[in-house]
Amino acid sequence: IRAEKARLVKEKKIKKDKNESIIYRGDDNSYYEKFLATGEVKCIDEEIPFEIPKGWEWCRLKHMCSMQAGKNISASEIYDKKSVLHPYRCVGGNGLRGFTNTFNAEGHFAIIGRQGALCGCLNIESGKFYATEHAVVVNGFGIIPSLFIYYFFTALNLNQYATATAQPGLAVSNIVEVFIPLPPLPEQLRIVSKIEKLLPLVKTYEQAQ
């Protein structure tokens, strides 16, 4: 994951984290965080909320993924229907807004609404698309599956990190510092597979109520 972050920084796709750190468990069984810029090491036992299974690791959210807001686009550049001239999906805080002639993201990402009533809204987007300023594109480092990130954020309850103002906004700078338990890749895939199998059953049950 650290190698992937270094590559993205070098390619200027993400900004260098001035407070980059690593979290590890010492010989005394306590958790420590080492800040790479200064070499400072501090015990973080009081910040660790619970024990995790063997093979899992505690990290901050910023160690797992980057979170980048999209770019502003004029309403006149967004069209209701897809066409040869406007083939790319334009994605806002609550999913599809329309279609446009350019894209600023390519891949498979979790998308988070970052302002107003749509603050904390989650979607998945694939391929080439345009993310507006109301959407945060979440890009997992390394080989972390985007669906694992999507379901993780769903469980995280993002609304708790919204600013308490007349126009709520997602405080990304706070979210990236949250401690998270990160399982090994095979376990990430098993978690996603299990959720995907259970969701249709949950929906069927909800419809029957």
Model-derived regions, located:
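Accessory (non-catalytic) regions of SAM-dependent nucleic-acid methyltransferases
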Residues: I1-E57, H63, Q207-Q209
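Short coil/turn segments at secondary-structure boundaries
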Residues: I14-Y24, S74-K82, T163-A166
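Non-catalytic DNA-recognition/assembly elements of restriction-modification systems
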Residues: K42-A75, D80-G93, L185-S193, L198-Q209
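Hydrophobic residues in beta-strands and at strand termini
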Residues: I52, G140, I180-L182
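A short beta-sheet element
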Residues: G92-T154, T163-V176
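S-adenosyl-L-methionine
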Residues: I149-L158, A162-A166, V172-Q209
